[in-house]
Amino acid sequence: MNHYSVLNLKDGKTYTDDEIKEAYRKALLLFHPDKCKEKPSVVYTIDQVKEAYQVLSSEKDRQQYQIKQEEESSHYYSIVDLSEFEELDNGSYYYPCRCGDLGGYVVTEDDLENNRSVVPCMGCSLTIQVDYEIAESDS
């Protein structure tokens, strides 16, 4: 079940809290058995609508959900160890793609710290998964 679909929102687009709340209200009316005048082609339960709203209305939960969705839907070309990437000056890492595009694969330290390890090529549709370990700081 895709939470964006339940609330009739486009997956991956950025929404304000008010837009998510409005979509939630519309979905409640659309899928409520006593309120709906026409039966929609896809029917979700009120519990599914509430769950979708609960996840998407929380910034933290929404980010975790989006990361999980991306990782589940990504069919990556290969797994590449971070040590094979070229470290750039700005805290990013670069790895060339077989398509030859100069953009290649770029991943940042923030991406990796936030468990975003599936990286798309800047020039084609290929993706890779970055294999890495987060170093513990001695604080």
UniProtKB/Swiss-Prot annotation:
Q: Which residues form a coiled coil?
A: none
Q: Which GO terms describe its biological process?
A: protein histidyl modification to diphthamide; regulation of cytoplasmic translation
The UniProt record lists the J domain at 2-69
Places the protein is found: Cytoplasm; Nucleus
Q: Which InterPro entries match?
A: DnaJ_domain (IPR001623), DPH3/4-like (IPR044248), DPH_MB_dom (IPR007872), DPH_MB_sf (IPR036671), J_dom_sf (IPR036869)
The UniProt keywords, alphabetically, are: Cytoplasm, Iron, Metal-binding, Nucleus, Zinc
**Residues at which Zn(2+) binds:** C97, C99, C121, C124
Q: Which Gene3D superfamilies did the record assign?
A: DnaJ domain, DPH Zinc finger
Listed pathway(s): Protein modification; peptidyl-diphthamide biosynthesis
GO molecular function terms noted in the UniProt entry: Hsp70 protein binding; metal ion binding
- Domain DPH-type MB: from-to ranges: 76-133
Q: Which domain of life is it from?
A: Eukaryota
What effect does gene inactivation have here? Sensitive to methyl methanesulfonate (MMS, causes DNA breaks) and hydroxyurea (HU, ribonucleotide reductase inhibitor).
Listed GO CC annotations: cytosol; nucleus
Q: What does this protein do?
A: Required for the first step of diphthamide biosynthesis, the transfer of 3-amino-3-carboxypropyl from S-adenosyl-L-methionine to a histidine residue. Diphthamide is a post-translational modification of histidine which occurs in elongation factor 2.
What remark about domains does the record contain? The DPH-type metal-binding (MB) domain can bind either zinc or iron ions.
Classification via PANTHER family: DPH3 HOMOLOG-RELATED, RE24848P
Report the family membership.
Answer: Belongs to the DPH4 family.
Instruction: Name the chain's protein.
Output: Diphthamide biosynthesis protein 4
